[in-house]
């Protein structure tokens, strides 16, 4: 039996503390969209440059790579579980770098997903390359794929066009890395910016849709989902980050904080029904089974 670590009062944000390999098989529910930020397998004792300091890039044991075969099997296992949790017209977004994204694309194809786009996130403020022996790493990739090759997926074309000054949105997104204001409650070592998740959610979901994140971290996906008027389930194995997710969600119950976030996220200005309160008038059915 699944017992949520935290569920918001209006039930639009749920965190389950556990390993997604154990949690996902335990319930029957279909999601409209999945966002996944799986391990990049790049914690190898290297160094980087952040906020004017040289820092170790090791994120934790969960990010240490194994053999190519073990990484491929890891990706096959979680992507298979996620496919079972998607509606037939649902889509999945997966972020990565060259360390893992090619393995993921290979597995997606073998499992029957249809890859729609590979988004290049071009960071407007990347850290410098301190070795000066190759180009600065300034991009990450996000694969967008749908579950079924022949079932039409959801894409909010006109909204994306409006956000892009009336022109078709391209597959290169120039967005900053995470800002200090996004770490007000604490931080996760691989935390994604709200601007990135907001655009992903607005592109491929509708109001009140359900979004799953099997590697939730500090639940940036969930915060962005709620700011966009969507509902969220996150699965996170580290208790410290499940706790951080709870604090972050409770923070946006404060009207002034929510309004500040909305004002900072440019894409939200184009949302027809902007949810400036976290308290809906009614619950919208199709709730999680726990």
Q: Where are the model-predicted features located?
A:
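Short alpha-helix boundary/capping motifs
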Residues: 110, 136, 228-229, 252-254, ...
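Short, flexible loop/turn segments with low-complexity composition
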Residues: 157-160, 256-266
